[in-house]
Amino acid sequence: QEKYGQGSVATSLTAKMENLALNAIYLLGTPGPKMIWQMGELGYNYNKWCTPEGVDKTDTGEYETSRKPVKWDYLQVPERKALYDVYCKMNQLRNNNPELFGASSKFTWTPSGWPVKTMDLSKDGKVVHVFANYHGISAEAKTISIPSGTWTDYLTGESVSGGSYTLVSGKALVLVNSSVK
């Protein structure tokens, strides 16, 4: 993100972790098996050419498969802990509702929607609606239309009613119906 990110995503830890959380929601919200790479749930920011001590050796091409620093202290950083919590909740959603993530579930999405991407999953009366605002400018909120009814945001536990909703930049809603565990 530091190399290719634009605006605050390249410079702000908060924006980076929010963006990574949106990516995690989209990765873990799609059906099929998943792999989390090397402390990605904490926003790990050492590249593959880093030594076990954390020294970047990109220019040498060495250390690609060597041990990497384990950064459990990242859990003490609120922005990184928030990212970790998103991974936990999304994995909990997957583990408690495996039928939603199997080949026979109904799945639709707008991966190219900008700035708000959406995803819908359903199976056997269980329904999940995901809305993620990828806009990089923190002041850029978007109005979305939530399906009618009362939903629970799986990430926060808050109740959300259908209708218009203002989704701020860098945030997501993972709305579930009462059948979802």
Question: Which residues does each PLM region occupy?
Answer:
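C-terminal beta-strand-rich structural cap/linker in extracellular carbohydrate-active enzymes
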Residues: S161-K181
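Conserved, mostly hydrophobic/aromatic
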Residues: L27, M39-E41, M90, H129, ...
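Aromatic/acidic polysaccharide-binding cleft in carbohydrate-active enzymes
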Residues: Q1-S8, L28-P78
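Solvent-exposed beta-hairpin/edge-strand motifs
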Residues: S145-G157
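Alpha-amylase-like alpha-glycosidases and glucanotransferases acting on alpha-linked glucans and related
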Residues: Q1-T30, G102, W109-W114, S122
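Short, solvent-exposed loop/turn segments at secondary-structure junctions
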Residues: E41-N45, K126, Y134-I137, A172, ...
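Carbohydrate-binding surface patches
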Residues: W109-S145
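Aromatic- and carboxylate-lined catalytic core of secreted/periplasmic carbohydrate-active enzymes
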Residues: S66-S112, K171
